[in-house]
């Protein structure tokens, strides 16, 4: 692609000399064209000494003069600090998504929630360098960003840094050019293109330095007057031949002209799709503001008014739609100006129309009011009078509105003097407020003037305001520039025409225009703009009919498209929110399944975009049919977390979801499909999507029927997939064959960290395969293997794996028919394993003999924190052995001994251990008949123990005397937070003892006294005691023979005495 950069001395010398300007330009063009010395017929014109150095010549006086010229052109600008630090690096992207190619910028920001895929970044100073040792520098680079993201700011910043020698040091020549400049020419040759950037190149005293490598910057492709057509453009290699500007640019990008020059193009995403992907070597994207950068941006706008800043930040954070749009820097500044004017306009809460904006149109109405008030004009100018404000608003809309409107229709965003004259714009009005707040003026290199709206959305707002006013008196179709059409009378007729045009525009270019047009009919906007732009109360005649018209646009199509969702945005702007609210209430109540009409589907898709709850997790469980899901597919792409449990989905639905997960636009990170009817065919469809998906990190398929074949398909995908970190196949009957397939995947996969294989009929052979994989795998952190049948053989195999595995942190072997032999093997491994933190052996067949092995391991192991031995056969002998280990162990924090036939003797041993142990924070002894003696032993420990925070003594045969000593312990204990005494028999006496403790205890947060025969008297004691305890957060007094009336009285008393405490009666 690229020729040698080191040329001969004669060739390298072609950048110096004192030849004529024409000869200098010719030499420069030859070098840019890659012809070297042979391409120039007048080398003597740029001759230099043979021993002159090669390379960029950054210290050459002529280069310095060029850098100075660039600095005068780009001027000052933001330094890389505060919110502008984001320009120090760009996101590397792999081509454009369908959303970027087809939808409006606002839709892109809303759908992606202000952020794209997690992507690699490239530093600005490495933007044009190879990404690896084996790659080459990119010739054609494109940087994309929605309108107002800072593309031109980035270019100017890069040019400024290059002129100071801080970036692009291997470029001897940087030629920045904007499409606004190019639009002033009908035809150009390559020679004239360069001269337009370098007017000083023709001066006899200045020659061009050696272009060891040159960079041509083309800023703002979306502003190009004529779309680029790479299919029908004739190739041109003659730099002197004048051709249409779009043909010239096309040939430069193709490499027919300037093949040795690096090309950097900036563009909005949709416009960049004109360039074939095969011609683009590198694509980057400017990221938007994050929350901190939004704050810094607003701080820089209002550095001296902290009250205003605090209020403004609270408004932005409270409105999700406003926050998302503020990730776009230009919109963030516009929002700051509008909210700042609102703040300064408020005189008190009686100003109903001065409350913060709830819609886009309200926000822009405040900006419009700011412009009319003269707040945005230069200091020193007098503010306009009230009558001037009203006249100025209508005159500005009349002056610029038609231009803005027809510019939208033609996708024209830059205007020149001839455009202004064609639409009757008085140029004299553009210099002051309010036009200066909407339109910016820029001189081009061709000595002409270009105008553009300060942000695309302002053009759309002014266009909507123009259309709103014109449609009230127009008799022909306003969308026809010539004005010749079938008669159209009445505002509603013209609104219907606008809605139809917007629905038919596949690229969404009229979406925001229609939102603004709808918003101008809302009561709040009418109150804001009455007198200056709108007539007081005129919206009332049309608002209801417009709402019906918009809802009529929601047809029962196969899929809910972006246009349909925009209708819901329009209804929101109109402040007609009944449809969206009904669907939101149905989602919250679980009644979504009965709302299946096209309007409800569109509203659901809209909520998936804008709802705060859906932003956290879109819960569509128990609510969707295949048809409804199919219609929502385009919108599900952008849900971060998606729950589709218990929807009776079968394999065909998985084909649909697979297509979503395979999409380049897919943003889904977590998806749950639990308790559906998915078989191996559906699992295979999902597996195919995992081969290409790069966003999904968690997949939950529990409670389906994928079987061994489905597990194999998913396992094969895991050998390639590098993003999935959590996979649940619980209850899928994958058996040993499925476990073997998963084990094979784990041998090579290095990203999966959680694998759930509970209830899958896996036996010893499957466990052996998984153990073999664990000997090699270092990434898996959690393995859930409960409710299988691995037996002692499987346990021994896993034990061998634990001796060498240094990654697994949690292992669940509940209900696996493991006896003492298997436990002994596992405990032998624990003596040396240094990574396992949690082990569950509940519901197995561990006897006192196995408990001895456990005790030995606890004495040797220094990493295990959680051990669950619930529902085994430890008895007192086994519990005593473990108690001895607890005395010595310094790392175990949670110990579950529920339902192990433990009695008072073992409880006494555990109590003695707790007096010495300083690490155990949770002890579960429920459903063990430890009685009052056991409770006394535990109570003695609580008086001195400072580590235990949770104690579970449900159904432990504890009576009043046991409660008495526990109460005495609670009176002095300062660490216990949870005490569960459910299902005992402490009675009124026990309640009184605990009540006395509650009066002085300051640590307990949850107390469960359910089913303890407290009676009314005992409950009253507890309720009364809480008047002095304001730290208890939850108490359960159910099942204590209090009666309904007593329960209400006790509940009210507790709420009175402890308002923050939740009561269960």
From Swiss-Prot:
This is NLR family CARD domain-containing protein 3. GO terms for cellular component: centriolar satellite; cytoplasm; cytosol; intracellular membrane-bounded organelle; perinuclear region of cytoplasm. Residues 1-10 have a biased composition (Basic and acidic residues). Directly interacts (via CARD) with TMEM173/STING; this interaction reduces TMEM173 trafficking to the perinuclear region in response to interferon stimulatory DNA. Also interacts, but to a lesser extent, with TBK1. Interacts with TRAF6; this interaction results in decreased TRAF6 'Lys-63'-linked polyubiquitination, but leaves 'Lys-48'-linked chains unchanged, promoting TRAF6 protein degradation. Interacts with PIK3R1/PIK3R2; this interaction disrupts the association between PIK3R1/PIK3R2 and the p110 catalytic subunit PIK3CA/PIK3CB/PIK3CD and reduces PIK3R1/PIK3R2 activation. GO terms for biological process: canonical NF-kappaB signal transduction; negative regulation of canonical NF-kappaB signal transduction; negative regulation of cytokine production involved in inflammatory response; negative regulation of epithelial cell proliferation; negative regulation of fibroblast proliferation; negative regulation of inflammatory response; negative regulation of innate immune response; negative regulation of interferon-alpha production. It is found in: Cytoplasm. Residues 139-460 form the NACHT domain. It comes from Homo sapiens (Human). LRR repeats lie at residues 617-639, 641-663, 665-688, 693-716, 721-744, 749-772, 777-800, 805-828, 833-856, 861-884, 889-912, 917-940, 945-968, 973-996, 1001-1029, 1031-1052. GO terms for molecular function: ATP binding; phosphatidylinositol 3-kinase regulatory subunit binding. Belongs to the NLRP family. Keywords: ATP-binding, Cytoplasm, Leucine-rich repeat, Nucleotide-binding, Repeat. Pfam families: LRR_6, NACHT, NLRC4_HD2, NOD2_WH.
């Amino acid at each position: 692609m690229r020729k040698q950069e080191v040329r001969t001395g004669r060739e390298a010398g072609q950048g110096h000399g004192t030849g004529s300007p024409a000869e200098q330009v010719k030499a420069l063009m030859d070098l840019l064209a890659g012809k070297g010395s042979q391409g120039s017929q007048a080398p003597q014109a740029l001759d230099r000494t043979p021993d002159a150095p090669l390379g960029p010549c950054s210290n050459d006086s002529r280069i310095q003069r060029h850098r100075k010229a660039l600095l005068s052109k780009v001027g000052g600008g933001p330094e890389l600090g505060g919110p502008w630090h984001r320009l120090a690096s760009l996101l590397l992207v792999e081509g454009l998504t369908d959303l970027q190619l087809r939808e409006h910028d606002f839709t892109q920001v809303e759908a992606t929630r202000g952020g794209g895929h997690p992507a690699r970044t490239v530093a600005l100073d490495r933007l044009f360098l190879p990404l690896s040792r084996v790659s080459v520098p990119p010739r054609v680079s494109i940087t994309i960003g929605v309108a107002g993201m800072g593309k031109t700011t980035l270019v100017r910043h890069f040019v400024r840094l290059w002129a100071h020698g801080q970036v692009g040091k291997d470029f001897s020549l940087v030629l920045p050019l904007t499409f606004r400049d190019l639009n002033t020419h009908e035809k150009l040759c390559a020679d004239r293109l360069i001269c337009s950037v370098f007017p000083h190149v023709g001066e006899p005293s200045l020659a061009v330095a050696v272009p060891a490598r040159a960079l041509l910057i083309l800023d703002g492709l979306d502003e190009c007057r004529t779309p680029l057509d790479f299919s029908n453009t004739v190739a041109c290699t003659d730099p002197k031949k004048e051709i249409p500007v779009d043909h010239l640019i096309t040939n430069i990008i193709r490499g027919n002209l300037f093949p040795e020059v690096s090309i950097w193009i900036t563009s909005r995403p949709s416009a960049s799709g004109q360039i074939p992907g095969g011609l683009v070597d590198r694509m980057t994207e400017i990221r938007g503001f994050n929350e901190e950068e939004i704050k810094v941006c607003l701080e820089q706008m209002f550095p001296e008014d902290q009250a205003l800043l605090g209020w403004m930040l609270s408004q932005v954070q409270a409105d999700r739609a406003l926050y998302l749009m503020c990730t776009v820097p230009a919109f963030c500044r516009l929002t700051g100006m509008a909210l700042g004017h609102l703040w300064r306009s408020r005189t008190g809460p009686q100003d109903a129309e001065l409350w913060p904006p709830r819609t886009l149109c309200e926000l822009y109405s405040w900006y419009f009011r700011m412009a009319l008030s003269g707040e945005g004009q230069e200091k020193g100018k007098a503010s306009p009078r009230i009558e001037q404000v009203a006249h100025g608003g209508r005159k500005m809309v009349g002056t610029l509105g038609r231009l803005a409107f027809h510019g939208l229709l033609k996708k024209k965003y830059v205007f020149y003097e001839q455009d202004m004259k064609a639409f009757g714009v008085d140029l004299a009005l553009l210099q002051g407020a309010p036009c200066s707040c909407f339109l910016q003026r820029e001189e081009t290199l061709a000595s002409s003037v270009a105008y553009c709206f300060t942000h695309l959305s302002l053009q759309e707002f002014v266009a909507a305001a123009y259309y709103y006013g014109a449609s009230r008196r127009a008799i022909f179709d306003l969308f026809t520039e010539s004005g010749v059409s079938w008669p159209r009378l009445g505002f509603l007729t013209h609104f219907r025409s606008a809605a139809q045009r917007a629905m038919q525009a596949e690229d969404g270019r009229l979406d925001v225009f229609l939102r603004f047009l709808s918003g101008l009919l809302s009561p709040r906007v009418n109150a804001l703009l009455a007198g200056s732009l709108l007539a007081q109360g005129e919206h009332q005649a049309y608002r209801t009919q417009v709402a019906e018209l918009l809802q009529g646009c929601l047809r029962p199509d196969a899929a809910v498209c972006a246009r349909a969702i925009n209708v819901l945005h329009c209804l929101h702007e109109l402040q007609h929110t009944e449809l969206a609210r009904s669907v939101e209430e149905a989602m919250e109540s679980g009644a979504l399944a009965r709302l299946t009409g096209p309007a409800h589907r569109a509203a659901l898709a809209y909520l998936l975009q804008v709802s705060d709850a859906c932003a956290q997790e879109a819960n569509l469980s128990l609510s969707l049919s295949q048809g409804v899901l199919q219609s929502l597919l385009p919108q599900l792409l952008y849900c971060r977390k998606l729950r589709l449990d218990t929807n009776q989905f079968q394999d065909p639905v998985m084909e649909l979801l697979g297509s979503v997960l395979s999409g380049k636009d897919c943003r889904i990170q977590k998806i749950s499909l639990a308790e559906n009817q998915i078989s191996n065919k559906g699992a295979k469809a999902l597996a195919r999507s995992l081969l290409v998906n790069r966003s999904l990190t968690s997949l939950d398929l529990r409670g389906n029927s994928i079987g061994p074949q489905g597990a194999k398909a998913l396992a094969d995908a895991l050998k390639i997939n590098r993003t999935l970190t959590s996979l649940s196949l619980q209850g899928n009957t994958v058996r040993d064959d499925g476990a073997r397939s998963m084990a094979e995947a784990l041998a090579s996969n290095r990203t999966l960290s959680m694998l759930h294989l509970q209830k899958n009929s896996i036996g010893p052979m499957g466990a052996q395969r998984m153990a073999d994989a664990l000997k090699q795998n270092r990434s898996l952190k959690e393995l859930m293997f409960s409710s299988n049948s691995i037996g002692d053989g499987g346990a021994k195999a896993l034990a061998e794996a634990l001796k060498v595995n240094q990654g697994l942190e949690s292992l669940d072997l509940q209900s696996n028919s493991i006896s003492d032999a298997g436990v002994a093997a596992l405990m032998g491994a624990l003596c040396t394993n240094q990574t396992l933190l949690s082990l569950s052996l509940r519901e197995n067949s561990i006897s006192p003999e196995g408990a001895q092995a456990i005790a030995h391991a606890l004495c040797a192991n220094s990493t295990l924190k959680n051990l669950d031995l619930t529902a085994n056969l430890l008895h007192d002998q086994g519990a005593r052995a473990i108690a001895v280990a607890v005395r010595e162990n310094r790392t175990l924090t949670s110990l579950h001994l529920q339902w192990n036939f433990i009695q008072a003797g073992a409880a006494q041993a555990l109590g003695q251990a707790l007096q010495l142990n300083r690490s155990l924070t949770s002890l579960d002894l429920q459903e063990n008949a430890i009685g009052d003696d056991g409770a006394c032993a535990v109570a003695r420990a609580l008086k001195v123990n400072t580590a235990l925070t949770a104690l579970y003594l449900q159904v432990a045969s504890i009576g009043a005397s046991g409660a008495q000593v526990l109460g005495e312990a609670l009176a002095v204990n300062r660490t216990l937070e949870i005490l569960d005494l459910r299902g005992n028999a402490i009675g009124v006496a026990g309640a009184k003892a605990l009540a006395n403790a509650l009066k002085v205890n300051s640590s307990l947060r949850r107390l469960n006294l359910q089913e303890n025969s407290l009676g009314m008297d005992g409950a009253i004691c507890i309720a009364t005691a809480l008047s002095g305890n304001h730290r208890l957060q939850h108490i359960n007094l159910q099942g204590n023979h209090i009666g309904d009336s007593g329960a209400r009285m006790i509940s009210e008393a507790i709420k009175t005495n402890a308002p923050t405490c939740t009561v269960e009666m």
